[in-house]
């Protein structure tokens, strides 16, 4: 077994959904005595293991995996929260001599990891819950009008129906008395020095990726992902909860209510996944510079 700890501080692997990056992470972790660390914003939740393609015990192949399924479905979990969890985890991995292998399709996580994300303030949970509740009861227009009174420049740049961003801007100004724009201009802490990491972006050919996406969604249906969605819906979470926006939730909810057939779910779920993968591919091509290795798996 080759150990890279003396030459690199981490391996970073990203790419669109269904690109094969999780299997690559396991392969590299086994080769270099590493541990896999999740960098996917949907795979952090303790629900939807099948629907979010969280690695199974078989797929993990005995390699330690961290930050998967550790967040309750209804909990607020931001990029900053993920970064704090990573910062708390890394000393233990270093002490064990394990090379961290980060893998996931959430580009902002990688920007945060290497210090390219704004250092946002902590928001009191009570304030966050209050504003999320008001968003549900009053709607985004009302909160947008309130934001316009205290931070007109930020309000002017936001879509009046973008409830999540409106709430985010409001909670920052209420908690700090400052515009969120003030914090967006500041760089966050560097947790992983990008210059000392091996960085890989997996960019499969379009036809290959689409075939994998179709196959993955068929597999999810065979593994009864709708049971996960049924359990999720039973929690009564607000539609604004991030976990409710996982691809496949709305389609399977429609199937459970009799509004869609299983074939409809397969077609529409796979189509939504392909669109998401297309957005990811565009983001990676624009954001990942030449220091990232391009792989086609």
Swiss-Prot record:
Residues holding substrate: 17-22
Transcription is among the record's keywords: no
Swiss-Prot/TrEMBL catalytic activity: adenosine(37) in tRNA + dimethylallyl diphosphate = N(6)-dimethylallyladenosine(37) in tRNA + diphosphate
InterPro entries membership: Dimethylallyltransferase, IPT, P-loop_NTPase
Record-listed ATP binding positions: 15-22
GO molecular function, one term: ATP binding
Coiled-coil zones: none
Region (Interaction with substrate tRNA): 40-43, 164-168
Gene3D superfamilies referenced in this protein's UniProt entry, alphabetically: 1.10.20.140, P-loop containing nucleotide triphosphate hydrolases
Site for Interaction with substrate tRNA, residues: 106, 128
HAMAP family: IPP_trans
NCBIfam families noted in UniProt: miaA (TIGR00174)
UniProt cross-references to PANTHER family, sorted A to Z: TRNA DIMETHYLALLYLTRANSFERASE
Family, per entry: Belongs to the IPP transferase family.
Protein name: tRNA dimethylallyltransferase
Organism: Rhizobium leguminosarum bv. trifolii (strain WSM2304)
Lineage: Bacteria, Pseudomonadati, Pseudomonadota, Alphaproteobacteria, Hyphomicrobiales
């Amino acid at each position: 077994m080759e150990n890279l700890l003396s030459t690199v501080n981490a391996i970073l692997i990203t790419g669109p959904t269904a690109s094969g990056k999780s299997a690559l992470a396991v392969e590299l972790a086994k080769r270099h005595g590493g541990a896999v660390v999740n960098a996917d914003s949907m795979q952090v939740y303790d629900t939807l293991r099948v629907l979010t393609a969280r690695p199974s015990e078989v797929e993990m192949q005995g390699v330690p995996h961290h930050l998967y399924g550790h967040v309750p479905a209804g909990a607020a979990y931001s990029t900053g929260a993920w970064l704090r969890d990573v910062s708390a985890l890394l000393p233990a991995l270093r002490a064990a001599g394990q090379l961290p292998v980060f893998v996931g399709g959430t580009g902002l996580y990688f920007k945060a990891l290497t210090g390219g994300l704004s250092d946002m303030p902590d928001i009191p949970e009570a304030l966050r819950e209050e504003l999320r509740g008001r968003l549900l009861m009053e709607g985004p227009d009302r909160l947008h009008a309130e934001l316009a009174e205290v931070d007109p420049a930020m309000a002017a740049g936001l879509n009046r129906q973008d409830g999540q961003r409106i709430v985010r801007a409001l909670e920052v100004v209420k908690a700090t008395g400052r515009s969120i724009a003030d914090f967006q201009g500041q760089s966050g802490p560097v947790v992983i020095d990008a210059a000392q990491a091996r960085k890989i972006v997996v960019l499969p050919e379009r036809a290959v990726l689409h075939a994998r996406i179709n196959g993955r969604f068929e597999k999810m249906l065979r593994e009864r992902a709708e049971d996960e969605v049924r359990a999720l819906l039973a929690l009564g979470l607000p539609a604004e909860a991030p976990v409710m926006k996982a691809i496949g939730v709305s389609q399977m909810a429609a199937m459970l209510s009799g509004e869609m057939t299983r074939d409809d779910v397969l077609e529409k779920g796979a189509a939504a996944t392909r669109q998401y993968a297309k957005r990811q591919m565009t983001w990676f091509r624009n954001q990942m510079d030449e220091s990232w290795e391009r792989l086609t798996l």
